[in-house]
């Protein structure tokens, strides 16, 4: 079974967490694209969605789902998103698609975060397989990079990428993130950092793993 097929299995299983007459929080990325495609079957049962990226917003509108601005809602019932890495405790690294700040905003509005992944994204310690993305205000790029080196990381400027917010991304290699919540706060306190891709304060309440045997749900 291909990775794409396992993503589709996880995405389809996430529909059970979408309640009728609600506004759904929708993340971004390849697994979320599978979820949006699956959500088309429920488009007449939900009020609409809040999207964490312009790409997801466009995909939702293309299938006829109304998209709301995050400022128009006070709370979401559920937020569905993927991850680049996720631990058994539900802490994640996200931001491979550079939408991490908006993903943090929309996920913070939700009562429940459902993370949909294939098995390759499961790790015991964050930083094992994927660098940590950090969104940075452009004028602070060099300063922030030096601070990340001081923390033990090896930051790499993501060439040619500008976020939906007009900022740049540093991908930090060589982090072995034993205490995700502490590291999330430490990096966010560096002047010029908009946010980083550790999702530990807003962790996943439910993880759905697509496997050849079907969807495995971890709560």
UniProtKB/Swiss-Prot annotation:
Residues annotated to bind substrate: 28-31, 81-84, 94-97, 121
Originating gene: rpiA
Active site: 103 (proton acceptor)
Domain of life, source organism: Bacteria
Family: Belongs to the ribose 5-phosphate isomerase family.
One Pfam family, short name: Rib_5-P_isom_A
Keyword annotations of the record: Isomerase
The protein's name in its UniProt record: Ribose-5-phosphate isomerase A
Species of origin: Actinobacillus pleuropneumoniae serotype 3 (strain JL03)
Catalytic activity entry: aldehydo-D-ribose 5-phosphate = D-ribulose 5-phosphate
GO terms for biological process, alphabetical: D-ribose metabolic process; pentose-phosphate shunt, non-oxidative branch
Function statement: Catalyzes the reversible conversion of ribose-5-phosphate to ribulose 5-phosphate.
GO MF annotations in UniProt: ribose-5-phosphate isomerase activity
Matches recorded under InterPro entries: NagB/RpiA_transferase-like (IPR037171), Ribose5P_isomerase_typA_subgr (IPR020672), Ribose5P_isomerase_type_A (IPR004788)
Record flagged with keyword Transmembrane helix: no
Pathway in which this enzyme or protein is active: Carbohydrate degradation; pentose phosphate pathway; D-ribose 5-phosphate from D-ribulose 5-phosphate (non-oxidative stage): step 1/1
Class of enzymatic activity (EC top level): isomerase
KW Nucleus (keyword) present: no
Record EC number: 5.3.1.6
Quaternary structure and interacting proteins, as annotated: Homodimer.
One GO cellular component term noted in the UniProt record for this chain: cytosol
């Amino acid at each position: 079974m291909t990775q794409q097929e396992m993503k589709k299995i996880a995405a389809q299983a996430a529909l059970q967490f979408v309640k009728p007459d609600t506004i759904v929080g929708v993340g971004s990325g390849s697994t979320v694209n599978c979820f949006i495609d699956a959500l088309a079957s429920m488009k007449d049962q939900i009020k609409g969605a809040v999207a964490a990226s312009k790409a997801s917003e466009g995909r939702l509108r293309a299938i006829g789902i109304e998209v709301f601005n995050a400022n128009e809602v006070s709370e979401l019932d559920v937020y569905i998103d993927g991850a680049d890495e996720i631990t058994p405790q539900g802490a994640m690294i996200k931001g491979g698609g550079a939408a991490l700040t908006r993903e943090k905003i929309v996920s913070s509005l939700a009562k429940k975060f459902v993370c949909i992944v294939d098995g390759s994204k499961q790790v015991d310690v964050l930083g094992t397989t994927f660098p940590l993305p950090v969104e940075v205000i452009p004028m602070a790029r060099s300063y922030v990079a030096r601070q990340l080196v001081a923390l033990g990381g090896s930051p790499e400027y993501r060439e040619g990428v500008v976020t939906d917010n007009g900022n740049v991304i540093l991908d930090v290699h060589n982090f072995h993130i034993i205490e995700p919540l502490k590291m999330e706060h430490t990096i966010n306190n560096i002047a010029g950092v908009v946010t980083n891709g550790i999702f530990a304060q807003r962790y996943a309440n439910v993880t759905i793993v697509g496997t050849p045997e079907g969807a495995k749900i971890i709560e």
